[in-house]
Regions:
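Active-site-proximal cap/loop segments of hydrolase catalytic domains
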Residues: 1-163
Length: 163
């Protein structure tokens, strides 16, 4: 998810119709600077420690999606978070979406859905999980058919004239 979110900051406008960011790790710098988070110190072995190494800090800042949001057009983005996620805290996608919404100059929409009963793996229970999948598929379909009309009776997409 980190890679997809970082690409959204760098890709030419219009390259992607949409992006689904499912529990995205987007605030790399702040997370890796917080030694009180349970997964941060063990991750320093792989990522490096930005607290003690300025080069690691600068490297993380260079690719961290949250730190690289710029005034530009972004694709439609659906960010999903879980309130009880121990890996990607719920405020990461929330902060990222807020920054995108206040900074972007076009494109979108950029929306956030926080599941108040879920962790990193999403909803539990068959029907709750199916509802999450339906939301993601519906968003993807809406992005793919933007500018087109979906004929639900025939299951086909018809071109729609631009105005």
């Amino acid at each position: 998810m980190l890679f997809r979110s970082a690409v959204a900051n760098r890709a030419p406008p219009g390259l992607f119709g949409g992006l689904i960011a499912d529990v995205p790790f987007v605030d790399v710098v702040n997370t890796m600077l917080d030694a009180d988070l349970p997964l941060t110190p063990p991750e320093w072995l792989e990522w490096g420690n930005p607290i003690t190494d300025p080069a690691v800090f600068e490297s993380m800042r260079a690719y961290s999606p949250y730190d690289n949001v710029a005034p530009r057009s972004y694709p439609a983005i659906l960010a999903l978070g879980g309130l009880t996620d121990p890996r990607v805290t719920y405020w990461e996608p929330a902060k990222w979406v807020a920054r995108l919404q206040s900074t972007m100059t076009g494109g979108g929409p950029v929306v956030l859905k926080t599941n108040m009963q879920a962790g990193h793996g999403g909803a539990s229970g068959r029907f709750d999980r199916l509802a999450e999948v339906a939301l993601e598929y519906g968003f993807a379909l809406a992005c793919a058919t933007r500018g087109a009309a979906l004929d639900t009776t025939a299951g086909t997409v018809q071109g729609k004239a631009s105005s």
